[in-house]
Amino acid sequence: MNLKEFESVLNQPANIRYEYFVKKVVDSETVWGLYEDGWAVTKDDNGNVLFPIWPKREFAEHCANNDWENYLGESMDLYEFIDDLLPRLKVDGLKPSIFFNNDDSAVLDVDILIRDLKAELEKY
């Protein structure tokens, strides 16, 4: 990915980045998070714990700063993500934070993300 594409996608509104995320992770069958002795998590202004995820390593590592400065991009298989990790997040009360750009992200219920990923998978 060239710098122009990277910056263009990164500067889109959260809802557009969410659509990009769904298409890219289904196409690559890979989801990216930040990892260092455990996955990176954060909290929103209401104290809800969020699990940040990205469509590509470059976007994840762009956010590896401040509390996450020693974290590295780590990939997850899309099917394990859908079948194992997302249900675990739901049980634990975490919400996915999709495509954080150091400013905002799309925060959705787990069930909505699963629905959207499965709908996109049906196109393949």
Predicted regions and their residues:
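Conserved NAD+-utilizing ADP-ribose enzyme module
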Residues: 1-124
